Structures are given as C-alpha cells and as structure tokens.
Amino acid sequence: MGAQYSTELNKYNNNNNNNNNNNNNNNNNNNNHTISGNENLNNNNNNNNNNNNYNNNNNNNNNNNNNNNNNNNNNNNNNNNNNNNNKNNGNSNSNSNNNNNNNGINKYSNYFESLINNTNKDTNIPNNSNSNNNNSDRDFIQNMIKSANQIKPGEKELVLFHKLHQSLKENQSFSIEELRNSSILSISPDKSFLTNINEINVNNNNNNNNNNNENNKVGVNGSSTTTTTTTTTTTNNNSNNNNNNNNNNNNNNNNNNNNNEDDEDDYGDDDTIENNEPTFVDKPNKSAKLQKPKLKSNLNDTNGGNSPQQNGKISKYMAKKLLALQQKQLEQEQEQKQQQKQQQQQQQQQQQQQQQQQQQQQKDAIENINNNNNNKLQPIVKNSVNKTTKQKKNKTTTHNVKQQITFLTKSDNEDEYDASDEYIDDDDDDDEKYDDDDDEYFEGNNNNNYKKNNISNKSKNKNNNDESDSFSESEIFKQKKLNHDKNQSNPKQQLTSHSEFDNSLLNKNQSRTNSKIQKLQIKEENYHQIQQEHGEKQQQQQQQQQQPQQQQQQQQQQQQQQQQEMQVDKEQTEKIINTNKKEEQKPNDYFPPIPTNPFKRDNETAFGKNNENNNNNNNNNNNNNNNNNNNNNNNNNNYRNNKPNGEGFLSNLKIIPPMISSSPYYSKKSSNVVPTSPKSNLSDQQPPFSPVQISPQKQSPATTTTTTTTTTPTPLKKQKKNKTNNNINNNNINNNNNNNNNNNNNNNNNNNNNNNNNNYSINNINNEEDEENNSTQNNNNNNNNNNNSPQNSNTNSNNSNNSNNSNNISNIVSDGYQWRKYGQKNVKGSLHPRHYYKCTFQGCNVRKQVERIGDTNQNSTVYKGEHCHGFPQTTRVVSDQQAFRNSVMFEGLDGNNNNNNNNNNNNNNYSSNSNSNGNGNGNGNGNGNGNGNGNGNSNGNQDQNGNSFNDQNGDSPTQHGQISPMNSPKNTIPTTTTTTTSISTYVNTNSTNKKNNSKQEKKISVKNETTDDDEFQEDIDQLSNNNNNNNNNNNNNNNNNNNNNNNNNNNNNNNNNNNNNNNNNNNNDDNNNNNNNNNNNNNNNRFNGTSESKGSKKLVIETGSSIDHLDDGFFWRKYGQKSVKGSPFPKSYFKCAELTCPVKKQVIQQDSKYINTYRGKHNHDPPESEAIEKRKKHFNGLYNNNNNNNNNNNNNNNNNNNNNNINNINNNNINNLNSLNNINNINNNNNSNQINNFSGSIQNNLKNILKEQLKEAGKLHNEIENNLIDD
C-alpha cells in the first residue's frame, strides 16, 4: 500500500524527476512535507517502473531536452511565465505572451503547489483567455479549495483529487459536447494528472507550437507498459541527452519547476483520438506542428467504468482501458493496411498475367494467319444476321471443335462471339459458325485491305440483351458498293478488288476462328489443370483428416479391447469371490465349506506347465519298475522348476475336501461350469485343485447371465452321470504318490487305494467345472498304477489312445433346474443353431438360450428372468433318469464321459485272470465282471476282446449272446440338444396288459438292449470301479493274500483293516453278493418265462401319487419326453426293459394326477417279488451312494445298507489320512519343512470336514429309513 500510495503522489509531484535533477532544491524540500521518507518511496517507484518496463530515467532525460528547447524559445518570457512553462512541457513546447499553451489542469497544478508550499489561500487562479468556460473552471476549483482549507498542507492535494474524482463519478452520463464544455477532469494513464477536457484544444495560431510538436508525438507509446515503445523513445533522443543536461544545469535556477513536471508524457489512448488528432506531446521541437485533438464518441464514461478507489487514491482503471483500446485500434489499422497491400499486389499480378496472355494470343494469331493463308473459305451471307442468344443455343454444329467453341465462349464474359455468319468448306460443304466480334476490316486499292465500319450491334444496342454483337450486312455492302464505284473505270482492277476482298475476308475469318480455338484450348487446359490441382488438394486434405481419425479409431479399439479384457477378468474374479463368500456364509447341506490355502498364489496352477513331462515320467515309471522313486522325484522337480521363485510344487495347491454329493441330479444346489478354452494355457485356466463352484442364483428379469461349456462330437458309449474316472488324473502329484507306494510297498495296497480315494475327493468338483481340462489327463493313474503288472504295456498304450477321445458332458441340465425345449433358431454365420428352453415349473417364466460359440467346442448359456421357486427335489427313483440319459441321444451334448472307463475295463481285463477273486475288484465290465459270488470260488475268464465273464458259479450281468450297453453300437450319436428335466416316479399298477394312445415318437434303433438291472448295476459299477480299474493291477502281486483274507471275512467289513488288502474290497464283498449276483440270476430267469399279460391292446390308468406310475410290476426304460402345449409338465415315454418286449407306455402329469397309457403285450413273465424288492434296494442304494460314494470318492460298490455307507465314510477318512502321509513321505525328499507345515494344516481341516460328513451321513441314513417305511 505504501508503494502504491507513493506512486500516486509522485505522479502529481514528479518526485522521480526531482531525484534525477540535483538543482531542484526547493521542490525536494517542499515534497518532504507530504510524507516522511519520500525519497525512499521514490526509489521504490523506480523499481516498480523497471519491473513494468517503464524507462523513467530515459524519459526524464528526454524531458530535459525538451526543457532546454523551451527555455531557448521563450527567453523573452521566462521571468513572467515560469509557472506556465514549467507545467506545459509535456504538450506545449513554447509559450507566447498571451498564454495560449494551456494543457488541462497543468495551469491549476502550479496553483495547487503554490497553495501547498506557501499556504496562501488567496492566490488568484490563473486565467485562460482562449477558454470559453474560465468562470466555471475557476468557480469549480475555488469551491473545492474552500472546502479543503481546514486540511493540513500534506493532505490537500489528495483531498482535491478525491473530490474531483467523485464529481467525475457522479457525472457519468455526460455527452461528448458536455464533457468538452464542462469542468469534469480526466485522468492521465501514467502520472495521474488531472486534465481539463476544455483546455486540451489548442489554437493553431502559434507557429512555435506547431513547430515543436512533430518530434514529440510520443503519447502513450512514450511510457507504454511494453518494452518496445519505451526503447523507441529513448533511442530517438539519446543524441541530445548530454547537451540538454548541461543546459539544464546552467539554467535551472529560475526553472526548477520546469524539470519537475517534465514527465507528462502520456495522457490518453489512441483509441480515444481520431487519426487527425494529436497524441499528447512530451518533447518539443522547433520543427514540430501542433494538431487539433478531437475526442471520439466512446468517452462517455470519463471515470473509465467502475474504477476502484482505495483511501482517496485515483486508480489506473481508465488508463489501462484507454491503453487497451488504443492498442486494438492500432492493430486493426495495421491489419487493414496489410490487406490493402495484399489486394493491390494481387491486382497487379492479375494485370500482369492478363497482359502476358494478350501478348501470347496476339503472337498465336499472327502465326495462324501465316499458316492458313492457303485455306479458302466462301462466305454465305444470310438475310437475318442478328439473332438472339436463344436462337444461338438452338443451332447445331457439325464439327465437335466448333461446339466446344460456342459453349465455352458463352461462359466467358471477355470473349463475346456471334455465330451469325456461316461458312462452307469448298471440300466438305459443311456448315460452320464463326464469330465476328469487334475486329476491323480494311480494304484499299493498293494494300488489298478493306476497312470495315466499327459500328456494331453491340455499340448500337447496348441496352438490348436480345441483339447480337455481330456486324450488320448493310454496312459491309455499303463499303463494297463504294469500292465498286471507284473501280468501275478499270474493270480489271475491279475484278482484282473483288477477289482480293473475298480472299481478305476468308483469311480474316479463318485467322479469327483459329485464334479463338487456340484460346479455348488454352482455357480448357488451364481449367483441367486447376481442376486437377483442386482435386489433389482435396484428396490430401481428406487423407490428412482421415489419418487422425483412423489413429483415434485404432486407439479406441485397442482401449475397448483392453477394457473388455479387464471387464472379463473382473467379472470372473467377482464371481469367484461372490460364490466363495456365499458358500462360506450359507454352506449347502451337501457342500461343506472349503478350507482356504495360505500358500495359494494367484494366476498359477499347481501343475505349472508340465503336463507333458508328467506323462513322460509316467511312461518311464511303467518301463522301469525298479526306479519309480527316482522318476517321481523328477516329476516333483519339474513342478518345482516351473515356479518363478523356485518354490515347492504344492505352494499353489488348494485341497478341496471330499463331498457328500457332487452330482447336479442329486444335490440341492448344483454348480455351473466355468468356461475354459481347450487351447488356452494352464496358467490362464483355473487350477485343478482350486475349482470354482458357481451356484445358480436367482436372477432379476433385467439381467442375464452367461455360462460357456465345452463339448466335442465324439462316439458315445453309454451315457452315465458318473464322471469320476475322468477326474482321477487331474492330480498328477497324487499319481506320483501312487507310483512310490506301488514301487516301495508291493504288498501294501491300502496306500494305493487310499491315494486314489484322495484323488476322487479332490476332483469331484473339478468334474463339474473343469471337465475339459480334466478329460485330457484321464489315463495317468492307469499308467502309474500298472507298474507291477506284466501285461500292462498293452493296456497303457490303449488307454493313452483312448484318452484323446474322452470328453465330458457339459450338461445343459446341470444347473439344478428342470427345462423343456420350445424352439430353436438358425444363427447367421454359424453352422450350429440356437436352442431355447423354458423352466418347467408352473408359473415360472425363466428362459435360457444355449448356443455353440463359433467353431470352438464351447456352449454359451444365457439366462433371462428370475426363478420364483427353489430347486426341484430330486426323485427317489433315480434309475428312470439315469436310464434315459444312458439310452436317449442328447441334443447338442457329447456324452462321452465313460469312454475311458470302458476302455480301461477292457484293457485291464487281461490282468483279471490272476485277480478274479471274491473281492469284487475284478476288471470286467460292470462290478460283476470277473467276480465270483463273494466266496472266492469263481474263476474269471476272458473272451476274445478281453471282456471277463464268469462260469456257472459266478453270475454276471453280461450273459453270453448279450452286448453290454456300454459297448453297444448305438452309442455313437451326432451332436444335438435336448432338455431332459422332469423326473418321473413310480406308479403302483397291478395291471399286466396295457396300451398306449399317444402319438408315435421317434425310435432309437438298438440291435441289442440290456435289462434294466444291467443299467442299474452299471451305475453302481461306475461309482465304485473307476478306481478299481487303476488299483487291480497293483493287486496282482498280492492275490494270495487277498484270496485268503477275503474268503475268511466275507461278512465282516472291518476285520481286514490291519491287513494289506483294501478296506474297500472288504466292503465290496457284501455289495457284490447283495447287488450283483442275485440280480443277475433273477434277470436270467426272466428270459425263460412266458407272458402273462391279458386284456385289451390299449389301456389308460390314472394314478394319484407321484410314486406309483413306475412301480407297476415291470421294469421300464425311459427313451424320450416331449413338452405339452399349455402344460408345464412334459410327456414321458417308457419302454419295457426286456430286450424283445414291445410294450410301451406314456405318462402325462396333470397337477397331482398321472395318466398312464399302455400299448402292446408283454411277451415275458413279470419279474418276481424278490427282484422287485432288490430293485427297490438298488434305487435306495444308488441314491445314497451317489450322495456319499461319489462325493467322497470311494472306490466301493454302492451299499444298500446304511451301515455300509458309514463304513465307507470311515474307510475314506482313513484313506485320506494315509494319502496325506504318502504325500509327506514323498515331499520329505525335496521340501520336508514346507510340506510338513502344509500337510499339518490340511490334516486338521480334513478331520473337521470328515466329522461333519459323518454327521451328514447319519442324517441321510435316518432319512432313507423313513422313506423306506413310508413306501
């Protein structure tokens, strides 16, 4: 504030000049009265001016020059007019005796200073003889002085300024004339002087004033805020600084005030002064002339708008505004000048080009005249020469060049034409048009030229647009007559003149036409060139515009791809996290919580990328039975080497405990399949030890969820829900454990079987989520476990070949709900149709779409809507659905789940000669293949294909002459889709003769069918013997022990736990006796019976329970179903399970009723009551074993008794603990410390889980007993 306050004072008192001029003693003393320390403030002002690029020092020197000039000019009046001269150096450089040079408030400023310095209140105000409003000015100032008499001397000048500023602010609506005639004062931009607008106008009568203004027109530029203007003022006056300073030092005794007020450089802005107005003057010169200033009309606001005030100070608002306006006006003037110069240059260039073109045209015309003198044309003069432009357009020309001439000359304003004269060639007699224009024709006696009148239709009829510009015929013939009259005296001369006249006309016309043709050709070329250049420029501009657009599009595409990838990753991770959280918060009855692994690492698998190495090591183990331990260690090292930090191969392992139920058909909540592409790296897929279970959640109608599954069209053997064999070989680590146990402990088979059980427990969930990856590794366990068998080289090679053909079923119905298909639609660009399904629950509107993704093996599923119900309850009679899935072709699905099981069974039958004993662990097809009746008396035999069967003492479900459904030729089917959802239950009907009245359905041609018992038996076998295929070869060396132990302990399941035999084998003895042999005997008896069916051919029966429609005394096999219009329940089709029986039936559900329609006659006896009871036991046992054995991965046959189920769970617990011990034994060779810690945590988790499973098994046992009682 202090610096700014000092600048305002110094602008009035010019303290900067006082510091620069050492002779101004009086003014310096007087100024010291205002504020103490004023010199310091002046120094601050100098610094501020330097920062603002104001060169005050240079300006002061320039002003000193002006003072010297003024003194020289006014030597006669120095004593009388010191005050006036001292205050007028900025704008008027000389003073006359009349005091005409008064600039604004400068005449009052001396009075203010004298008032302050001398405190003389009665001093007269100076007069201005030339001003019209002296009285008003004097009164104005006197009134202000009277009001300021009581103020101290140091504050008077501030008060005056403040009051003047307020008066300006109050009078903002004055016009220009009022401002000129009033005493309102304006503010200078730089020094804050108040100038009276009336007294800016200066008379032109003083010659000295006119001479002194030319070199002093500095105006605003003298003290502008820009550096360029200030430097110009200093450079212009540097030559006079030395002399002027000396003069000032000698002559400043009487003129101290002159030097003090020299800095009145700038008072206004060029924007407020017209071109004929002068800028405010600083430097007087004798040769300068003073101009009359005229203010523009934009000075309505003398205060410069809302200028801020602080403590009575006058701001620089108006000064800045005026400066900005002046700069804008200067820039506009410069731009106008530049535009004018450019226009002039362009006009000059155009004129030069026109002149050059005219010269060229003249040259071309002369050359054409010389070249075409020999061509002669005969003119044909017509009566009507002048024609309108409309008639010209209607005329046609025969020559193409002439057409171009007429067309182009019409568009040209300079070259006007007339096509009125037509000429005919002597040779072709073609009509041609030529223009006459304003050319002159000359004729003479000697020069053979005829002069033609310059009068044309154009000159005569300038205002008529319809008349042409050609010459009239009358004028031409008048000249001809005149010439003819002149030459009548000389007939020879007359003849020559006529001939010369004709020749001259012909030559003239021809030269004109040729010249015009050339002009037109030149114009055409120029036009084409310009058009080409313009087209090229446009193309370049378009390319330049398209390049950034293309780049932007590429960048946007890249960003979108990245965003999509990120979104996919986020969605997958969110699904994984959400499902894990939900499972932890709300565990299913059949799915206990999964223990988390602290050693798990993201984006890695337990395998790394060494699946190929694992297979190679397994082959080495098969070839080198004595060195299995070394090979296994190599496998472990391979796992370890794939880790980036060299960590243990189990650092990323996530163990999943054995589950009670993993089948979507029997579980309350099933899991969706996590999509994995077959060609993707293992590092990008879900690790096999950490499968992700995504339970189907209730979905809102606005949202859709998609799941992708993988299927491949391969031959289908027998479609079973059992998928355990495919999942055994995911855990290559446990396979290595099996190798070690087999090689080190040939007599101990418990560890081998236990390890296999652990594989089941880990991989059941993988079976539903990573089926494709699991299916590619199906035969590793077979290779590993067959080390000790002498005949396993063939079986291993066969298994390796069959593993490529094994693919899992990506079941459409595996989401836990029941669906029916209501249509399909072809997809553009794809060979596979899109299938549409609807939930079968009554009132539920949920739909889903299933579609094959491109040429890949993935199916995408899209759900729409939200289920209004829970998961449907599973049926008690599972065989119906199992039979359907085993016999009916799936549309769009590949049911090759059990190919490996079949091949393994067939291949392993070679080793069943030494292993067929009462253990039930034979390698035949089905659990009874190669097994005795449980007493160890049967001898397993083999057919030519390696399929084992029994002699008379051992009954097998695969009889001679029968083909197993698993090996039947019907199982190779194409790829289609279906919805098999509704679950049928039994109906108790005692009728034997039943008919069918429904529509005929498509039949599946099957040469050889199996009995329903065979199917159920195979279901049990698939649950139990998948690991038996892997373990029986290991038991080859222990046949003696197995025979002895099993013969002694047929009924005691737990007596052989301490022996080398498997606990599972002991449990399987009872199962084989109860489930396999007796059923097979009953089935064999049915072939010899006679049919007892009587009655009509067609029978319809209505039942009221959901259980009675299948339990009618016969065994049925479901072969299809169909959706019914207007009903949420489908129609089911069944066929008698006997091979040769033609009886069929249809079942339609209507709310709580079931309508059964039978057709045909049975050609066999009904099954005995014992078989029916055993069949019920099969159903119950299959249901229980599917929930217990599959998820716990027992290698046992399904048990019908609840005690056997509990024993199986106990055995599996022991097996799991043994498997952990085996893992510890192997890993102690490599990373003992790490694996021990990890295994300890796993054991604790498994113990807790197994306790929970035991409780759940007890609950299941109670539920089964209650259901049996109800039945």
Curated annotation (Swiss-Prot):
InterPro entries, alphabetized: WRKY_dom, WRKY_dom_sf, WRKY_plant
SUPFAM superfamilies (UniProt xref): beta-sandwich domain of Sec23/24 (SSF81995), WRKY DNA-binding domain (SSF118290)
Subcellular location, principal: nucleus
Gene Ontology molecular function terms on file: DNA binding; DNA-binding transcription factor activity; sequence-specific DNA binding; zinc ion binding
Pfam families: WRKY (PF03106)
Chain intervals with Low complexity compositional bias: 13-103, 116-135, 204-216, 223-259, 370-388, 443-458, 610-642, 703-715, 725-766, 774-811, 895-918, 938-956, 967-995, 1025-1085, 1184-1210
Coiled coil: 9-71, 320-372, 520-574, 766-786, 1013-1040
Top-level taxon of the source organism: Eukaryota
Region spans: Disordered: 1-138, 204-312, 370-515, 578-650, 667-811, 890-1095, 1180-1210
Subcellular location: Nucleus
Residue positions binding Zn(2+): 839, 844, 867, 869, 1136, 1141, 1162, 1164
Ranges of Basic and acidic residues composition bias in the record: 475-487, 578-587, 998-1010
Biased amino acid composition, Polar residues: 1-12, 297-312, 488-515, 672-702, 957-966
Biological process according to GO: regulation of DNA-templated transcription
Ranges of compositional bias, category Acidic residues: 260-274, 413-442, 1011-1021
Gene3D superfamilies the UniProt entry points to: WRKY domain
Bias (Gly residues): 919-937
Keywords from the UniProt entry: Coiled coil, DNA-binding, Metal-binding, Nucleus, Repeat, Transcription, Transcription regulation, Zinc
PANTHER family per UniProt: WRKY TRANSCRIPTION FACTOR PROTEIN 1-RELATED (PTHR31221:SF193)
Function: Probable transcription factor. Interacts specifically with the W box (5'-(T)TGAC[CT]-3'), a frequently occurring elicitor-responsive cis-acting element.
Family of this protein: Belongs to the WRKY group I family.
Name the record gives this protein: Probable WRKY transcription factor protein 1
Organism: Dictyostelium discoideum (Social amoeba)
